From Swiss-Prot:
InterPro entries: Calsequestrin, Calsequestrin_C, Calsequestrin_CS, Calsequestrin_middle_dom, Calsequestrin_N, Thioredoxin-like_sf
A single MF term (Gene Ontology): calcium ion binding
Protein family (similarity comment): Belongs to the calsequestrin family.
Compartments it resides in: Endoplasmic reticulum; Sarcoplasmic reticulum; Sarcoplasmic reticulum lumen; Mitochondrion matrix
Biological process terms in GO annotation: positive regulation of release of sequestered calcium ion into cytosol; positive regulation of store-operated calcium channel activity; protein polymerization; regulation of skeletal muscle contraction by regulation of release of sequestered calcium ion; regulation of store-operated calcium entry; sarcomere organization
Modified residues (Phosphotyrosine): Y37
UniProt lineage: Eukaryota, Metazoa, Chordata, Craniata, Vertebrata
Glycosylation sites: N344
Region annotation (Disordered) ranges: 376-395
Protein's UniProt name: Calsequestrin-1
PTM remark: N-glycosylated.
Residues bearing the modification Phosphoserine: S75, S210
Length: 395
């Protein structure tokens, strides 16, 4: 295959990977043109000779730390696909001052050590003095969205009624808000420094407006922490708080009773298991049954928010269409209906709640009873293994 053919194949592959197959006869209209890779190489091979200049060139730099691709065709193709994802993201974000690079774990081991790169096949994002490990889906759109968030300030200011309403509408992730005198306040600066530690995974908000603070029942230099899907906040004690106090509080409370699996942080969430297991709930929010089940989950979570042993991961299948067939096959479940079960993160063994009536969802009380059995160990994936062994013996 010559260079021109190879380039054509790479472009076609990227479009299929990122944008899907184009419909025959459908052309992009002005204002709705999806980006197509223009063939310009923007992703830099970062090494000992050029890494200092590369860091000086970009406000934000995303580096893929990778092991050398194997010689087989599948490994080579996989690496090309990953490189093409970075190329499209680099093209889209070129005017934003975002650069992209590759660091080979063998050829450039010395550079990797200097930069603190430790986990292969991970993307590390450098912004000023902060290093952020990207733990999300390896796709151009998700990566671009994440990096646009990185470019934003770590603290968003609430200055009026509309911004307050937008803040209150955020329910599916942890959020913090503090009330301070002004930007020069030493307590606001401590809050901002703490925000940088969690940016962009956890949103931090602040207000200098006494009217906004009154509606939020915030006192001066007070910080409220909202757990995901919880209506009432918890106030960080002993105001005014230092950066260390804020960071420690967030670290201690960041695992919500109910948390949503999101493309931009899916691996971080999945790796934060409870003794090797996850309680996983599948529910399509756009589906009537899924919405109803999600409301039941919220109610149960709100009633049990003080239980540190309970954490449920909610997955909306609509967010991960490529994973739906895998989940259905691996867990032997039908994701066209809501499901909740226990998953072993080591071997993907699972056991799922049986619904007495397929047309009726469990009540909050029934779900709480089931969760209590899970937490007490009466329902676990080992029991499922024992049943499989019994079936084998019968054979």
């Amino acid at each position: 295959m010559n260079a021109a053919d190879r380039m054509g194949a790479r472009v076609a592959l990227l479009l299929l990977l990122v944008l899907g197959s184009p419909q025959s006869g459908v052309h992009g209209e002005e204002g709705l043109d999806f980006p197509e890779y223009d063939g310009v190489d923007r992703v830099i091979n970062v090494n000992a000779k050029n890494y200092k200049n590369v860091f000086k060139k970009y406000e934000v730099l995303a580096l893929l730390y990778h092991e050398p691709p194997e010689d087989d065709k599948a490994s080579q193709r996989q690496f090309e696909m990953e490189e093409l994802i970075l190329e499209l993201a680099a093209q889209v974000l070129e005017d934003k001052g975002v650069g992209f690079g590759l660091v080979d774990s063998e050829k450039d081991a010395a550079v990797a050590k200097k930069l603190g790169l430790t986990e292969e096949d991970s993307i590390y994002v450098f912004k000023e003095d902060e290093v952020i490990e990207y733990d999300g889906e390896f796709s151009a759109d998700t990566l671009v969205e994440f990096l646009l968030d990185v470019l934003e300030d770590p603290v968003e200011l609430i200055e009026g009624e509309r911004e307050l309403q937008a803040f209150e509408n955020i329910e599916d992730e942890i959020k913090l808000i503090g009330y301070f005198k002004n930007k020069d306040s030493e307590h606001y600066k401590a809050f901002k420094e703490a925000a940088e530690e969690f940016h962009p995974y956890i949103p931090f908000f602040a207000t200098f407006d006494s009217k906004v603070a009154k509606k939020l029942t915030l006192k001066l230099n007070e910080i409220d922490f909202y757990e995901a899907f919880m209506e009432e906040p918890v106030t960080i004690p002993d105001k005014p708080n230092s950066e260390e106090e804020i960071v420690n509080f967030v670290e201690e409370h960041r695992r919500s009773t109910l948390r949503k699996l999101k493309p931009e942080s899916m691996y971080e969430t999945w790796e934060d298991d409870m003794d090797g297991i996850h309680i996983v709930a599948f529910a399509e929010e756009a589906d009537p049954d899924g919405y109803e089940f999600l409301e039941i989950l919220k109610s149960v979570a709100q009633d049990n928010t003080d239980n540190p042993d309970l954490s449920i991961i909610w997955i909306d299948p609509d967010d991960f269409p490529l994973l739906v067939p895998y989940w259905e096959k691996t867990f032997d479940i039908d994701l066209s209906a809501p499901q909740i079960g226990v998953v072993n993160v080591t071997d993907a063994d699972s056991v799922w709640m049986e619904m007495d009536d397929e047309e009726d969802l469990p009540s909050a009380e029934e779900l709480e009873d089931w969760l209590e059995d899970v937490l007490e160990g009466e329902i676990n994936t080992e029991d499922d293994d024992d049943e499989d062994d019994d079936d084998d013996d019968d054979d």
